[in-house]
């Protein structure tokens, strides 16, 4: 009889412990679900910059529809955290496909770089696009039109170094258009669409170089470019839109950069004359620089800057011998 009672008590206790264990497990699952929160698909709408200076910047040049690439970083901040951490990144060429699933219990920060190819194209290797779309793991990125979730890898935005263009050539100021923007503290509970504003980080340069009366004239500018004009050549006339190197700073209104233009004139008798002049090139402004070498001596440099609104500027650089 005692044995039977002991057996019944053992069974009852086992059932009780099993129920308690089940309750504890279910409670843990419930908390985990609550911690994960509700997931929501969010679309991104990129608002590109349109300003009154756009027409003057591109007025004298037919602007073709260059290929656009959209590089996007997404950062997440959980309720228990005070700072953002890497969440996802992706490279797109179709803006209609830019969407991502987010947790409604978290806040998000977005970062976007648009590169619109122009006279220069980005270098595309077998493994993907190079700078400015090399990841923090030093790898090229392919266009997948989708996000890759990662807590350790993304794009090292904002870019502030060289850009790799066709031919695997690295330049500081490529002849293409970069736009950049960020958005902080987006709450997925408040909207189904992220509206992210980007601004251009570009300047225009219209360079005119008259051929020298004799010999050869070389003009080096923007660290990577050199034009060579002989006495028998026609006037050099070229206009392009370039991107600044310091992208984050260059999207600010009124931003400008100072660049050295180096002139080297080799005369027929082998005599070499050099001149260096720094010019200020302004964001969203097409600057016209005209370089002329003429007589008589002494050497001088004449600079004439337009005093009207900063949309189009003329600068004459005359070197007299």
Where are these regions (language model features)?
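Hydrophobic, aromatic-enriched interface-forming segments
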Residues: 190-225
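Bacterial N-terminal signal peptides
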Residues: 8-16
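Short, low-hydrophobicity acidic/polar segments
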Residues: 77-199
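Hydrophobic, glycine-enriched assembly/anchoring segments
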Residues: 289-321
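Bacterial N-terminal signal peptides that target proteins for export
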Residues: 1-7
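Structural motif
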Residues: 45-65, 208-215
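Bacterial Sec-dependent N-terminal signal peptides
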Residues: 4, 16-52, 284, 311-321
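Tryptophan-paired
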Residues: 66-126, 215-285, 311, 315-321
């Amino acid at each position: 009889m005692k044995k039977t009672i002991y057996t019944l008590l053992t069974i009852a206790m086992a059932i009780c412990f099993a129920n308690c264990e089940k309750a504890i497990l279910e409670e843990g699952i419930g908390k985990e679900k609550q911690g994960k929160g509700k997931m929501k698909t969010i679309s991104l709408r990129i608002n590109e910059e349109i300003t009154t200076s756009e027409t003057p910047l591109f007025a004298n040049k037919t602007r073709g529809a260059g290929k656009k690439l959209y590089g996007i970083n997404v950062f997440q901040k959980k309720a228990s955290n005070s700072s953002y951490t890497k969440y996802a990144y992706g490279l797109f060429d179709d803006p209609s496909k830019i969407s991502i699933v987010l947790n409604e219990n978290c806040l998000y920060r977005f970062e976007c770089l648009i590169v619109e190819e122009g006279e220069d194209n980005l270098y595309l290797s077998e493994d993907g696009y190079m700078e400015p779309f090399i990841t923090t793991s030093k790898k090229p990125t392919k266009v997948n039109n989708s996000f890759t979730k990662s807590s350790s890898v993304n794009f090292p935005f904002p870019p502030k170094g060289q850009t790799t263009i066709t031919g695997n050539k690295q330049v500081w100021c490529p002849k293409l258009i970069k736009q950049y923007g960020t958005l902080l503290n987006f709450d997925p509970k408040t909207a189904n669409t992220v509206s992210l504003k980007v601004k251009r980080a570009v300047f225009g340069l219209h360079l005119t170089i008259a051929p020298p009366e004799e010999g050869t004239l070389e003009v080096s500018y923007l660290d990577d470019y050199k034009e060579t004009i002989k006495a028998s050549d026609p006037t050099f006339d070229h206009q392009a839109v370039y991107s600044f190197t310091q992208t984050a700073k260059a999207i600010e209104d009124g931003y400008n950069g100072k660049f050295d233009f180096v002139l080297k004139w080799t005369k027929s008798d082998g005599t070499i004359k050099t001149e260096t002049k720094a010019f200020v090139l302004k964001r969203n402004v097409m600057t016209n620089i005209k370089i002329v070498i003429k007589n008589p001596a002494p050497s001088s440099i004449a600079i004439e800057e337009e005093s009207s609104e900063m949309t189009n500027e003329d600068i004459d650089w005359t070197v007299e011998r």
